[in-house]
């Protein structure tokens, strides 16, 4: 947040600093607009402005200044000075005339000369996108610029525009600025207070019209009215349900049926008509008249249609020529009132055949019903500002950056936003194939294409985005011109089958740059300046993301058109006009669709078990704001909207009068639809299951439920008479086997003296009347000890004994016994120690306590409950049905029975297909079945091995770069992709679980709490948790340090944490929090390193309502990677105070599984270089570290596998003392490393260690886990070849295998070669890492193919580079290798262009003082200057010249190269004579240079340059080039030279032969400066010869050109740096291109954004001190002190002193015309 504030401050500090811009502070503290005292009679309004900004503008007509005010837009007569105005759309009552009275204002005059400002820019007309800016004349009214005095419009103006959907619309304009061009002065009227009265207003008629036409679907439009609060708020939609008028060509009747059925199910009341109806007709006039009548009739009945659907092409519904555009338009079908405002949302499903209409409908139905198999594409968006050298940097880039900044970002749920604000556009349209939910292009277009970057209608037909249909918007010319002779671009986009878009918004005529800008971001946006949400009216982007509106494709277009309406200037034809834009833009496809904004939410709903007949309404629970519809067979019965409590009252316009299944559909903007069926009729007597839940793991679905809440569904309650006045109640239950019964004895200390009861059962039923007396006690005194055992088979309790003082009794609680069903005698005894009697309980209950021949039925449970009854006691008996077969469960998936006869309350199904499924469970009783209870389940992934996503390929020079995204979902070897093991998922619906821990570290008594405070709502439900930095109820300011800690986790391989967070109050949003992981304990001290730490900023809250009103901020999803071994995760709220609450919800942790095992073979590494993808450290600093060796280069080497190994030397021609590290990439999760090593058999003591690091890759991060000194390896064993090198044989040992266990937490592995010297080498090959865990979704690697040949495998990164690729077209493919199989390949074509002009590399822009310094690297190869050149240099001799670069401009390079030409280790020398006087004397014209022995100074005396440098005139010399090459750099000029070949056998110093393309001896040869001459020796017949190649080596073979914000500011540069003076305070785009002789490279660009203004750290021409809170600045110039809001606090010359309040400040000093800015903090 601090950086953002400093950026703001830096822009405000521009007063007088630079000629580029300045800001004039006005006499108001803030810019503010208010509407108060709003009624049908009048309203009051105030307008205040805190600043005016001046911006320098370079034009074809010269240099001018542009003046702007936040929230205003430029106005003026064309060619006259342009000034800002504010425009508001207002609602005007029926019959009223709006009158404006100015109550007060302030006025000040400002001299622009004091700010170094030029004259104000003349206002220019709107420019069509079809215009060439270079050919459009610059409008300049000379008379206007000679006029003296202040000129401008009246302060206020009001103009009636028309009626829009029942609301009369007028434009209120405030003109706060007048301008005196001669004096160059502004007059600013500020703090304006006005009253707008409505004279003649008819309040009753106004409200009646509004009520009759109202629909919440027009909320987007109503919200743009300045005085919108005047109308009654309609919170319910069932009073005004959605109505749609459909007019279609007769040939589409059958094709339309599925769409009409769905719209009725969704809750649309349809009025459908066809052109073969006489009332409709086929002409434009008759169709228009019919539609107007339908609307007016509907309005009179308060049933006006919301949508108008036109179905067919112009052959059935023609449209008409626009009054302003002169192109085809559908506007006038829906503009009923005679103005240009439509009354209905109109869209055209343009199709020329029923088949094309079916294509459109199929895409719409899949999108609206959300039946696409993979919804993740909805989280992706494509945004393109197309190419235009003039307008792209002024409007295009700003449009796309606004969309990304405020909406299309992670905060709003987007995982991938493919943003192309400027070139290059490489691969941009490939994203349409891989899947995006939204695509927006703004720039040039044609009837059949988006122009640049180009995608044509033909290419649209070749798209491959099946099941991934999107909304497309084209802000460009004529792409929706639907009467074009062939299908226009928008028609093709929607008509194509199983690809393309479900809807397209575009313009029929040419569109305009300014209006398209306003259309997207809102009116008042200033060209060339990045717009802000606060500074613009509502545009189409803003409307799309209104949280609580019924956003449709049509409402997005309306918002754009209203923004253009905002910008139309009263009285001046300065813009193309709102009327033009209402005629221009159209929706092709289905405009009634509500687009999903990233991943839609899940609706929380509860449906009734059944729908009773003949009811006027039904109550259905759903998420607040949901639209609920009940229908049957495509006929709509009723609709309703869920209120704030989540209850929808569905008002039935057609009552249910018969049984059957009825469709219930629940929809809400950005929520998945709910599509269910409910049976109509009386409630079922058969109870269903309860608490049905469904979970998924991969493609396994697990259902769990609770048994029916009571088991009374088998029959009604039965009361059975069992004796005189005695009854028993029998009801369902379940516990025992079918042939058994259960008897339960229950008591609750009936007598209060701890005496209890016993139950005695006689299975022979012959004890009644003898052992069991008919009356009186069982016995008195002492009974026989075997009384019970001899007479009663079953006892309760089991140890009951015949003792009156017994403790074996049921006092409190219950006992039970299971008995065979049958006839028994029984009695219930009550031993009484005081009387010495064993009483039999009384008969005061519903059942006797003694019984002769009682039948206990099998399958029943008999509960005898003892109780007081008057002065005695008694027994109440309850009998329950205890049969296990009283019911079973049946399971359905998607309406199909998949399992029946279940008795358990759980069910699992594996291998379920990916997608959305409905699982239902019903209970089957003997006499009937219960209603189904259902649950929606989403199974992720697909049934194949998932491929990579979004593969792109690019080429620079001969280097190809591939990039891709990981497979969708997280596939595993099942082969079905598995989303991973969910370790924890918590939505806090029931508060903070007991297993979570909270710590109130600051001890204020306020920690994390469950979200049940007023106004707190969870992300996707009611529950969340929160922590306070300001407490309500008198608590006040808090300084929290609160921890919320998860239960213990098991994440051996790490995991991924996702959660949702928001600030409770969008206006007090700066809540600071962090996320930590601990691998040890869960105390606060265990959480030290934050994985994520941030402050939620107000700028981060992008919901329009959240900015405009104080409500809960926007929920944002965060994702954090958890390290291996994580045991606890903590959310810490701290470093916040005096804000409000931070809310947390939907915490989910998924465990990472096993990463794929992988083996490093070093086959992709290059001989003699450090191994690819490994890090090396030469810790001893001898310049000789680990490097790759190839057996193809070394005869003595044999790799373990393939050809390559890595090696480190302790002797390499000299003794070495190595300390070399070879470090792996991140191998988190590895448990073992297996590798092979070899050494020199004769010198085997090269010591090495295997080391691990759990942190970083510095040498100090590693510890030893294994080390050894190889010794005695394979003595006397095999040898693997001998070297031909001078140091003799290097016998290699056999390869030795080692496996080392790695400790938990290992992140990097290093092989260290050290503690040895003067031996030879150690080799490593085939290093294999075994990863821990079980196979999971991340268990895969990537394989890359070029032209069908595998070139790289085992990749784990999502990028790949290959250099040196041959010229031509290549197909690159990437496949995913899983444990169980491989994915389909994804492929991309890449072209290597030999004439490509290579660009610069690594361009950077950095501040330096007040300047911006650019630095870059030269092009990777300098062969772009021209084609290969062959030059004749003598008879039959040619030299090839091609580009290169190595030496300084006045020098040349000579290279001598050979490859053991004669096979005898004799080589060559190159001798150059700079005096060029040796030819014919020292250098003979023919024959050898000398024979025998030459003078030792022969070379030094005659030749200034030698190759090799130590060449000597000895025929036995070793100082020669045998294999390889040598070189020398010489001044460019004329030389004599010769190339010698010493031959010891003959004793001659031969001069090489002339068998090549260049003589080996030469008189006066010119070596040109800036060239490289390579002389390659070769055999030529019986002799030898020289082939010479000359390369252009001049550093000036190209120059650099620098651009700032699209304007060329420097060319002809040869250095790789450039300083742009005085530019560090503003944001700029810098570009550098390379200019070659034959062409120019692509530009490479970088955005420079100042961090505040660049800090000055050295040689500051001022002193700055802070003592306490006093800031003192001393300088020889001007000094100013600002706060971080840009307010100037103090200013003066030489010395400025200011006493601060604490916080951040900025000091600006201007000395000798140069500015310096420094930030400081005052505590």
From Swiss-Prot:
Residues 25-228 form a propeptide. One of its GO terms (biological process) is hemolysis in another organism. Ca(2+) 2 binds at residues 337, 339, 341, 343. The record marks 228-229, 737-738, 1155-1156, 1290-1291 as: Cleavage. Ca(2+) 1 binds at residues 313, 482, 491. Proteolytically cleaved into a catalytic subunit and three adhesins. Arg-gingipain is involved in this post-translational processing. It is an enzyme of class 3 (hydrolase). Pfam families: Cleaved_Adhesin (PF07675), DUF2436 (PF10365), Peptidase_C25 (PF01364), Peptidase_C25_C (PF03785), Propeptide_C25 (PF08126). Ca(2+) 3 binds at residues 987, 989, 1021, 1023, 1145-1146. GO terms for cellular component: extracellular region. Residues 1-24 form the signal peptide. Residues 965-985 are annotated as: Disordered. InterPro entries: Caspase-like_dom_sf, Cleaved_adhesin, Gingipain, Gingipain_N_sf, Gingipain_propep_sf, Ig-like_fold, Pept_C25_gingipain_C, Peptidase_C25_Ig-like_domain. Its EC number is 3.4.22.47. Ca(2+) 4 binds at residues 1000, 1002, 1004, 1006, 1042. Keywords: Calcium, Hydrolase, Metal-binding, Protease, Secreted, Signal, Thiol protease, Virulence, Zymogen. It catalyses: Endopeptidase with strict specificity for lysyl bonds. Transmembrane segments: none annotated. GO terms for molecular function: calcium ion binding; cysteine-type endopeptidase activity. The active site is at 444 (proton donor), 477 (nucleophile). The keyword Metal-binding applies. Cysteine proteinase with a strong preference for substrates with Lys in the P1 position. Hydrolyzes bovine hemoglobin, bovine serum albumin, casein, human placental type I collagen and human IgA and IgG. Disrupts the functions of polymorphonuclear leukocytes. May act as a virulence factor in the development of peridontal disease. Involved in the coaggregation of P.gingivalis with other oral bacteria. Belongs to the peptidase C25 family. This is Lys-gingipain HG66. It comes from Porphyromonas gingivalis.
